[in-house]
Amino acid sequence: MTEAILRSTLGARTTVMAALSYLSVLCFVPLLVDRDDEFVYFHAKQGLVIWMWGVLALFALHVPVLGKWIFGFSSMGVLVFSLLGLVSVVFQRAWKLPLISWVAHRI
């Protein structure tokens, strides 16, 4: 599937929708609006997993002592993976983000 996605030519709308996938709660826009486009759907699923990771990181703040550390490292991970996803959209590639793509594939 990834090879077919890589070979497609992308328009501006497709690129914008795929980029929205990695901007926190905006990942739901491509999931609901552009579900038929494989490139957008691929990135939207990865963006959804990153968003869920961020939400779970917020709950880590309720853990005494270690909660702040868990939240800090998780926030850094969310930021790094979101930036990697945005870079892959800019280069019009469907990079499988480590661990994120494994979970996204099962959604």
Swiss-Prot record:
Residues 1-13, 68-69 are cytoplasmic. Residues 35-46, 91-107 are lumenal. It is found in: Magnetosome membrane. Disruption phenotype: Single non-polar gene mutation and deletion of the probable mms6 operon (amb0955, mms6 and mmsF) leads to weak magnetic response and much smaller, elongated magnetite crystals. Vesicles that are probably empty precursor magnetosomes are present and can grow to wild-type size. May be useful for the manufacture of precision magnetite nanoparticles of uniform mineral type, and consistent morphology, with high magnetization. Addition to an Fe(2+) and Fe(3+) sulfate solution increases the quality of the magnetite crystals. GO terms for cellular component: magnetosome membrane. It is a multi-pass membrane protein. It comes from the Bacteria. Keywords: Biomineralization, Magnetosome, Membrane, Transmembrane, Transmembrane helix. Its function may be negatively regulated by one of the MamGFDC proteins. The keyword Transmembrane helix applies. The keyword Transmembrane helix applies. The chain crosses the membrane at residues 14-34, 47-67, 70-90. Plays a major role in synthesis of cubooctahedral magnetite crystals by controlling crystal growth and morphology after nucleation. Has a partially redundant function with MamF. When overexpressed in E.coli the soluble protein self assembles into shells of about 36 nm. This protein mediates the formation of magnetite nanoparticles from a solution of Fe(2+) and Fe(3+) sulfate; the crystals are larger and lack alternative iron oxide/oxyhydroxide species seen in the protein's absence. This bacteria makes up to 20 cubo-octahedral magnetosomes of about 45 nm in diameter which contain membrane-bound crystals of magnetite (Fe(3)O(4)). May oligomerize. Belongs to the magnetosome MamF/MmsF protein family. This is Magnetosome protein MmsF. It comes from Paramagnetospirillum magneticum (strain ATCC 700264 / AMB-1) (Magnetospirillum magneticum).
